[in-house]
Amino acid sequence: MSSNLLQVDFPRLKSDVEALAAIGRADDQGIYRMAFSEGDMQARSWLQERIVQAGLELYQDGAANLFGRLAWDPDKPSVMVGSHIDTVPGAGHLDGALGVLCGLEALRSMKEQGISLKRPLELVAFSDEEGRFSGMFGSQALCGDISPQWIHAARDLSGMGLTEAMAAQGLDATEALSAARSPESLHAFVELHIEQGPVLDELGSSIGVVEGICGLKRWDVRLTGVANHAGTTPMLMRSDAFQGLAEFSVEIDRILEEHGGPQSVATIGRVELQPGAANVVPGEARFALEFRDLEASVLYDLSDAFRRTLSAIARRRGLMFDFKVVSELVPVSCDQRIRQLIESTAQSFAYNH
C-alpha cells in the first residue's frame, strides 16, 4: 500500500452502525438477530446492498459467509478483515457489527481514494459466529473444519436443526462443505472487536492487542437423583440433584485456583431442574459448563479436575453423573508479526494499549 494516510468518513460509519443496529432491535433495546432468523436475513440483505454501493465485489460462499472484495485476484493471497452481524438474544449493537462495518468503511475509503494495494482485500461477515447451532459455523466452514455429520447433527436449544433453519431461508447447509479455503489463499486476517469485559476500562486503555484466542470446552452436564416430596422427605434421606449442582458451583473457584492459569475462566450459564416444582426435591439437574484458557494443557487439567469433582460429589450425595461434550475449540496464538504491526500503529497514533 502507498504511504498516504487513509481518510475515513466517520459520519458515514456512524450512520451505518445506527442503521444496522435498528435491524432486529426489540422493545427492551436489545438486538435479536440470531443466525438465519428473519432479523439476521434482513441484516444480511442490508449489508449486501452496502457492499455493492461501496463498489466492492459481492460474494457469498456455500456457508452463507458474505464477502466484499477489493482488487480481487484469486491467484494472490488476500488480507481479510471482518467479523459477524448475527447476535445472541438481546445483544448490544457493536458486538461483531463494529468489526464488519469498520472493515467496510476502510475498504470503501481505500477504493474512493484510489489507494494502491499490494494484495487483494476481503471484507467478511461470518454466518452463525455466535453459535446458535453449537460452534462457529461460517468460520469453521471456511477453515474446512466441518463434516456432513456435523452439519446434520447441529441443532439450536429449541431443537431446530441447522439444515432446517437454512432451508427455510432458501439455503442449503450441505453447500458449506464447498466453503473451505486453503491457508495459502490468505495472507492475514484482522478483526476489530469491542472488549466484552471490564479490563481495558479498568486500566484506562484505549486498545488491547490480542495475544491469542482462548480454547473452549462446553459440556452439557446432568446430575440425576430421586424426585421426592419436599415436605415429607428428611434431608438426610434425599438424593437432591440441585444440592449436587450447588456444591459443584462453589468448587469452581477452588478448581480454577489449583488447576487453572491466570486467564482461566469457567461459567455455569444455564440450569434446568426437573420436575421443577416448589414442593418437589429436584430429581435431575442439568446445566451447561463452559471453561476457557489460552493453554491446551490447562484445559486438559481443568477437564480432569471438573470430572473428578463432579464424580466425587455424585457419589457422596447418591447421584448419577454424566456429561456430553457439546463444543470444543483449541486455543490459538495470534501471529506475532501482525501483533507488532498493530502495536506500532497504535503507538504512532498515541493510543494507550
Task: Give the predicted meaning of each segment.
Residues 54, 66-98, 103:
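Catalytic-core environment of secreted peptidases
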Residues 25-71:
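A non-catalytic alpha/beta surface segment that caps or lines the substrate-entry region
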Residues 61, 116-117, 176-180, 254-268, ...:
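Flexible, glycine/charged-enriched surface loops at secondary-structure junctions
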Residues 28, 77-90, 224-230, 349:
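Glycine/charged-rich beta-loop-alpha catalytic/anionic-binding loops adjacent to active sites
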Residues 2-37, 325:
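N-terminal capping segment at the start of a domain
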Residues 87-158:
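A generic, well-ordered mixed alpha/beta core segment in the N-terminal half of proteins
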Residues 128-297:
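Midchain, well-structured core segments that form catalytic/ion-binding scaffolds
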Residues 324-353:
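An extended, acidic, His-containing surface patch that forms the Zn2+-binding/catalytic region
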